[in-house]
Each structure stands twice: as structure tokens, then as C-alpha cells.
């Protein structure tokens, strides 16, 4: 899955090197009390940083998972107050991004001016956090954050979809039991690879001897139909579902005639073309006649900003990766991978660091201070943002030429077990990793009962919530997922 690289850096907390697990296990929970205003509601809440020992699939102690929880001090009824468990992807990265990006009581505020120096980023009160409607628990899988495997357990034992999810499943069931919350409505939020984890965890919770049936799952930057993101030459669906993202980027960078259409309107027009005329032309392959090929190539230019001549020479295809270097090639600029709104000069070799990686600078800078000043965490341990795991090292669940990766089927299983279970899918228009077209395609092909899934698109990239208006839209959607009303909106 080369099109979905991870963020490769580690954030050090304290001056010492990474501690042994024994030192981590010695820490007692750190509890602090706070007051915040979220969605206009004043909330007194308790922040708790604590570790929970979890077993492996055989029941043997395997890891200590450290979480950050925020719980309302004065709920109307603690047993019925919703709780949402939050994690990122990686495959193994800490929950830092969702924690400080959108869901926690503080958030990194990134200016609308994309050229702004990261030194101008600020850590602000997060008025968008859904703490007004749910308690939040941020999970760092073993080998990330302060979480570690126990002696006798190798980190590699968790390098699979199933084992990784089993660890999180064990943590959630234990947390709910220890905190007396087994009757609380429970939800998951996963981002990027975390959406695959969320699907598997939801199913594993339902398969426990004493099942835990979640009320819902939110998938941000969904990747459950991961095969549609890998643009092999013969995977024609992947090119069709990627066109809406190319159209969004061409519209944003003013490389197409907008025809007075908004971003949403332009993308929808490109999507209609992609799933009809474009997909049909791709299916014809080398049997397509010259006149139709030329007509489709011209339409592709109108939507993507890439000259028709390029499409004629490349079988009516351009990969997302190639597109990043082609759209603004005349200006010597490369588009961001995580967020294609960001640009940076290409090197002599035509390569450059992902221009949108500048977003992460603020997170690294603020998290250390937040831990110490707000949460009173002053442990000497290293807070590991990401465990560097090659995608080829990860066991995705299928092997051999006839394997399948039906992650969406795991959510279908939960829907059948719980008629009230629902799914929110959110994606950023300018995200070239997990694209809006593929998300819409996933919902259409999932076989989920009608009205159980809601699909929302936001301005921005892989972390669309770094855009102020998208932050509000996304958290409003999360509140809708948790609330009583559910206006399902399936893919058009």
C-alpha cells in the first residue's frame, strides 16, 4: 500500500531515552480537574492518564496500554452518558493527532494562510470538542505513546489487523468494566488505518463471550476499502474513484474553468462523469476508438487540469502520486500528499518531502507542554508518536492471489447484531491518500442496511479538521452520530 505512507517521527518527552516497561508500569494514574466550554456548554471534567494491563488472544498478560480520558464530573446519569474511544492509524501511531487536532479539550489552531510559519500556530481551547455530549478516551496502542508490551511479548506480535484490534478490544472491555461503564452507550472514532482497526474492534467486541454492542463508529479518512486506493494499472475502479479528488485539487489551485461552481458542485459533476463515461472508457481498454478516447481525454482535462495529451499518451490514466507532480509542474511545485492544498518546490530529482507535513510541526511542539502544564504528567518516559512498521511487515488478513480484505463486512456483522448501530464516514476533499470518491464507493458497495451510514466531506486533507470550518462540521457530525436524530446521507 505504497500510496499511504506514514508520518515518520518520534516526539521525545523528558530528557531520558525510552524507558523500560517496568518504569512505565510503576506510574500511578495522573488525575487533574478542569473546566471548559464545548459547543456553548460549560463542563467540569476530570482528565485521567492511566495504564491498563491487557491480555493477548490466549489470555496471557501482554501489554500495558496507557490512555488519556476526559469524563464529565456532573453527568445527568453516568451510566447512560456516552463514551467514545478514539485512536489514530499508522498502522501504529499514537492518538496525538485526534487528541490535539479536534477531539480533546485543547486543539492546535492552524491559520487559513497555508504559507504561515509553524511558529504562528497556537494551542487554544477547543470549543468544538464533543465533551459536551460524551466522555472521551484516547488510546495509544502498545509501542506508541506511553504504552508498552510486557516482558516476554514481542512488539511484532501485534503487527496484524486481528492482533492489533484484539489489544484495543481488550482495553475497551477492561476500561468499561473498571470504570463501571458497561451500560454506557459506547462509540469508536478511528482515523486512516484506525478506520480498519475500528471496524475490526467493533466486530471483536460483538464476538466477546459477553458481547459489547457499540452504538456507532466514526471513520475519519476511511480506508476500509483499501484496495481502491492502490492504483495498479488494471484496477480501473481506483482511477474512477480518484477523479473527484483530482477535480477538487484542480478547482482549489485554479487550474480548471470553475464555471461559477462551488467546490462541492464541481466535485459532484466530476464524480458523475467518473462513474459513467470515464469508467466505461477505462473498461474498454485498448478497444476504445480514437474519437471516444480523444473526447474522454478532453473531459478529463476539464476536470483535472491535466492536458488531454497526457491522458491520450497514458491510457486515460494518471495516478494520484503522479498528479501531485504534474498539476503545478509549470511552476515547479509539488502538491502535498496528506493535504494537496499545500505546495512546495520540487528538487532536481523531482522529489520533495510532503509539503503538508508542515502541519505536524505544531503538534510536536505543543504536546509536550500540554502533558506537563495541563495534565500534570511529568514522566521521564519517551512518548513515542509512531512505531516505525513497514507496511510489508503488517499482516493485513489475506494471503495468496485469491485473498480478500473485507473490512467493511466486519461492520455489516455488527449492524446485523445491533439494529441501532450506525456509521459516520468523513473524508477531506483534498486528501490524496484516502479519497472522497473511494469513500462514496465503499458505502455503495458495503451492503449496509439503508439509513445506517452517513457520508460527510470536508474542506481539507487527511486531517481536514485542521481547517476551522471543517473542525466545526466534523464535530457537529460526531454529535449527530451520538445524538437521537440521524439524518443518514448515503453516497450520491
Predicted region positions:
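N-terminal cap/lid subdomain of alpha/beta-hydrolase-fold enzymes
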Residues: 19, 59-157, 444
Amino acid at each position: 500500500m505504497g500510496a499511504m505512507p506514514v508520518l515518520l517521527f518520534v516526539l521525545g518527552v523528558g530528557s531520558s531515552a525510552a524507558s523500560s516497561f517496568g518504569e512505565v508500569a510503576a506510574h500511578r494514574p495522573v488525575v487533574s480537574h478542569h473546566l471548559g466550554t464545548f459547543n456553548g456548554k460549560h463542563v467540569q471534567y476530570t482528565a485521567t492518564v492511566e495504564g491498563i494491563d491487557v491480555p493477548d488472544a490466549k489470555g496471557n498478560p501482554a501489554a500495558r496500554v496507557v490512555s488519556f480520558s476526559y469524563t464529565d464530573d456532573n453527568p445527568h446519569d453516568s451510566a447512560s452518558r456516552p463514551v467514545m474511544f478514539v485512536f489514530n492509524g499508522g498502522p501504529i501511531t499514537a492518538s496525538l493527532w485526534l487528541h490535539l487536532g479536534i477531539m480533546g479539550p485543547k486543539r492546535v489552531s492552524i491559520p487559513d494562510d497555508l504559507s504561515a510559519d509553524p511558529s504562528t500556530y497556537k494551542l487554544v481551547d477547543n470549543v468544538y470538542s464533543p465533551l459536551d455530549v460524551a466522555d472521551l478516551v484516547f488510546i495509544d496502542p502498545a509501542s506508541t505513546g506511553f504504552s508498552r508490551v510486557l516482558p516476554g511479548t514481542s512488539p511484532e506480535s501485534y503487527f496484524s489487523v486481528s492482533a492489533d484490534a484484539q489489544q484495543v478490544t481488550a482495553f475497551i472491555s477492561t476500561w468499561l468494566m473498571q470504570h463501571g461503564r458497561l451500560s454506557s452507550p459506547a462509540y469508536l472514532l478511528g482515523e486512516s488505518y484506525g478506520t480498519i482497526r475500528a471496524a475490526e474492534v467493533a466486530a471483536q467486541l460483538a464476538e466477546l463471550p459477553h458481547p459489547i454492542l457499540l452504538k456507532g463508529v466514526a471513520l475519519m479518512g476511511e480506508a476500509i476499502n483499501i484496495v481502491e486506493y492502490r492504483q495498479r494499472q488494471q484496477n480501473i475502479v481506483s482511477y474512477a474513484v480518484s477523479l473527484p479528488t483530482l477535480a477538487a485539487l484542480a478547482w482549489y489551485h485554479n487550474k480548471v474553468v470553475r464555471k461559477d461552481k462551488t467546490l462541492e458542485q464541481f466535485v459532484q459533476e466530476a464524480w458523475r462523469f467518473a462513474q459513467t463515461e470515464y469508467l466505461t472508457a477505462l473498461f474498454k481498454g485498448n478497444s476504445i476508438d480514437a474519437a471516444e478516447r480523444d473526447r474522454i481525454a478532453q473531459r478529463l482535462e476539464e476536470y483535472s487540469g491535466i492536458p488531454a495529451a497526457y491522458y491520450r499518451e497514458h491510457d486515460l490514466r494518471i495516478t494520484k502520486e503522479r498528479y501531485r507532480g504534474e498539476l503545478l509542474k509549470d511552476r515547479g511545485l509539488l502538491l502535498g500528499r496528506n493535504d494537496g492544498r499545500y505546495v512546495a518546490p520540487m528538487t532536481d530529482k523531482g522529489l520533495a518531502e510532503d509539503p503538508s507535513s508542515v502541519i505536524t510541526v505544531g503538534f510536536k511542539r505543543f504536546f509536550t507542554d500540554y502533558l506537563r502544564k495541563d495534565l500534570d504528567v511529568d514522566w521521564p518516559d519517551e512518548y513515542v508518536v509512531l512505531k516505525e512498521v513497514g507496511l510489508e511487515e503488517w499482516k493485513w488478513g489475506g494471503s495468496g492471489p485469491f485473498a480478500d480484505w473485507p473490512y467493511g463486512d466486519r461492520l455489516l456483522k455488527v449492524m446485523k447484531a445491533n439494529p441501532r448501530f450506525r456509521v459516520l464516514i468523513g473524508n477531506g476533499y483534498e486528501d490524496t491518500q484516502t479519497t472522497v470518491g473511494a469513500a462514496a464507493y465503499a458505502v455503495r458497495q458495503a451492503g449496509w442496511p439503508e439509513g445506517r451510514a452517513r457520508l460527510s466531506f470536508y474542506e481539507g486533507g487527511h486531517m481536514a479538521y485542521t481547517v476551522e470550518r471543517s473542525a466545526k462540521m466534523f464535530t457537529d457530525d460526531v454529535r449527530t452520530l451520538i445524538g437521537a436524530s440521524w439524518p443518514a446521507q448515503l453516497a450520491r
